[in-house]
């Protein structure tokens, strides 16, 4: 399957235009259609301004260019929901996308997507109900070979006990989720938010942060992550836009 993150329509030209994001995404989607993955996950910040209907409409229009046979799952980022993650922003997001978390199984692996902005913003009621849902999904997936998590925010960037900052989930919440990851043997989390590639781990739980598809802030060029899931392992590689392979050998 393929993960891409932070297309953030409108960021490149400070909300004046999204023509560059459209051009990049159309190239990426042509490559995705050629690869024909089992599914695609977009880990948040679909647009730069979650209140800009033109940005949202263009993102959705471009995503419809992905072949209908390829399921596409999206998750909210802080730009989609606002930093405060208000009731209004959550409601508007649900109206646009229909869901803010997901779970499904493919070939005996369980894939789970979280609304991480509600955790970051400490929206207690919403976060608590999602946490209860998450634990039930994890508990019911113990016969699967893998449990793989997706979210916009990574739980942490470098160290599991690192200080709270804009890039991670606050410590008081983070420990709860890391304990769940250990208890239910979650192997991987794929996240975004940082606009650069990074990897870290906690016990047997691996966090992979994927660069922005449109607005990189680090040394890596724009690109996508291709993930291959085997019965005994999960393997992934990042490819910049000009180096995406024409096929993937399992």
Model-found features: residue ranges?
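Hydrophobic beta-strand anchors of alpha/beta hydrolase catalytic cores
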Residues: 1, 40, 111, 147-148
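N-terminal active-site segment of His-dependent metallophosphoesterases
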Residues: 1-56
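Active-site glycine-centered loops adjacent to acidic/histidine catalytic or metal-binding residues
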Residues: 6, 44-45, 77-78, 114, ...
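Short acidic, glycine-rich surface-loop motifs adjacent to enzyme active sites
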Residues: 42, 141-159
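Extended active-site neighborhood of metal-dependent phosphoesterases/phosphodiesterases
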Residues: 53-146, 164-167, 171-186, 199-237
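Histidine-centered catalytic micro-motifs
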Residues: 148-155, 187-197
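Acidic, His/Gly-rich catalytic cores of divalent-metal-dependent hydrolytic chemistry
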Residues: 231-250
């Amino acid at each position: 399957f393929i993960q891409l993150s932070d297309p953030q329509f409108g960021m490149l030209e400070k909300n004046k235009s999204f023509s560059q994001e459209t051009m990049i995404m159309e190239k990426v989607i042509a490559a995705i259609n050629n690869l024909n993955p089992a599914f695609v996950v977009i880990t948040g910040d679909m647009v730069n301004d979650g209140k800009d209907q033109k940005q949202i409409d263009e993102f959705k229009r471009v995503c419809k260019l992905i072949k209908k046979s390829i399921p596409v799952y999206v998750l909210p980022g802080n730009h989609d929901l606002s930093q405060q993650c208000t009731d209004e922003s959550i409601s508007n997001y649900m109206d646009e996308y229909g869901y803010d978390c997901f779970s499904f199984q493919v070939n005996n692996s369980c894939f789970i997507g979280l609304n991480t902005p509600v955790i970051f913003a400490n929206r207690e009621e919403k976060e608590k109900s999602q946490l209860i849902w998450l634990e039930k999904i994890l508990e019911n997936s113990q016969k699967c070979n893998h449990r793989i998590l997706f979210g916009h925010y990574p739980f942490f960037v470098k160290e599991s006990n690192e200080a709270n900052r804009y890039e991670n989930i606050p410590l008081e919440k983070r420990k709860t989720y890391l304990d769940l990851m250990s208890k239910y043997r979650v192997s991987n989390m794929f996240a975004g938010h940082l606009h650069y590639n990074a990897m870290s781990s906690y016990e047997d739980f691996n966090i992979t942060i994927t660069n922005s598809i449109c607005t990189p802030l680090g040394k890596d060029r724009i690109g996508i992550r291709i993930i291959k899931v085997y019965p005994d392992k999960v393997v992934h590689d990042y490819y910049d836009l000009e180096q995406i392979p024409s096929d993937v050998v399992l």
